């Protein structure tokens, strides 16, 4: 369920804004989105896992706050990220 270090490094390399970037909003949102998608698949098969569902809701809230921050700070970066991740259909 947890995201592997290898996958996390792959996401960081894909979404980084500069060479030593690991904590920009884009990277954080990409990592959260991947974790949310994995947890969503888990919850489809384990419908009564309420403990994990609460973790999912917390991650969705955190991602939402980061997206709001990015939208207020730089709309073009926000739109690029939304398109790249396939959010907001």
From Swiss-Prot:
Any Pfam family hit: Ribosomal_S15
Keyword Transmembrane annotated: no
InterPro entries tied to this protein: Ribosomal_uS15 (IPR000589), Ribosomal_uS15_bac-type (IPR005290), uS15_NS1_RNA-bd_sf (IPR009068)
GO cellular component: cytosolic small ribosomal subunit
HAMAP family: Ribosomal_uS15_B
PANTHER family in the cross-refs: RIBOSOMAL PROTEIN S15, BACTERIAL AND ORGANELLAR, SMALL RIBOSOMAL SUBUNIT PROTEIN US15M
Role, per record: One of the primary rRNA binding proteins, it binds directly to 16S rRNA where it helps nucleate assembly of the platform of the 30S subunit by binding and bridging several RNA helices of the 16S rRNA.
Protein name per Swiss-Prot or TrEMBL: Small ribosomal subunit protein uS15
